[in-house]
Amino acid sequence: MKNKIIALLVLFTVILFSSAQAQTTAHKFEAGKNTFLLDGKPFVVKAAELHYTRIPQAYWSHRIEMCKALGMNTICIYIFWNIHEQEEGKFDFSGQNDIAAFCKLAQQHGMYVIVRPGPYVCAEWEMGGLPWWLLKKKDVALRTLDPYYMERVGIFMKEVGKQLAPLQVNKGGNIIMVQVENEYGSYGTDKPLSLIHI
């Protein structure tokens, strides 16, 4: 009986360490000539759109499992700036807003993540995710090279980077791509220079 218990403990330890190692193994993700490549092999991104801010945190795991059950291998998420910086200079990445926890949870379920941090995301969200307080600055020109706007975008992106940089696929995480901005140029008045700067 004692030998069986020891054998089970050894087996459990091996499984625990091998699964932990598998979750933190660095990978190489790149665009090939005609397809995406993961560790040099063709990889088809089968993605589901899942907005962590629209799902109570208690249901995150269930929703990720549902996406996986549908045959998806990737979750796409928007990062709504106006949720994370409701007051200028005060950032919240905790609880319901914990994007790193959401990405790690997706990784535990064997899913990759495509992050779309905006700054503008649209997604039928108030001001496309831009915080209301940007409009307190007289004559601010959103989604342009306006100095105040670009300064605030830079600060926000750095805060997002602090949360997510360690979760990139090449660092053992599951973030395979980042899409900056959304629907840029759709209205014919957007200036391409601000997109290049971001």
Residue ranges of predicted features:
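Bacterial N-terminal signal peptides
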Residues: A7-L16
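N-terminal carbohydrate-binding accessory modules
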Residues: A22-T74, K104
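Conserved, mostly hydrophobic/aromatic
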Residues: G40, I75, A106, V160, ...
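Hydrophobic faces of well-ordered beta-strands that scaffold small-molecule active sites
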Residues: K46-A48, I75-I77, V113-V115, I176, ...
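The substrate-binding groove and active-site-proximal loops of carbohydrate-active enzymes
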Residues: K46-P56, W81-N97, K136-G154, E181-K191
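Aromatic-lined substrate-binding rim segments of carbohydrate-active enzymes
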Residues: W60-E126
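An active-site-proximal structural segment forming one wall of the substrate-binding cleft
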Residues: I99-V115, K138-I175
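Conserved small/polar residues in nucleotide/adenosyl-binding loops
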Residues: I196-I198
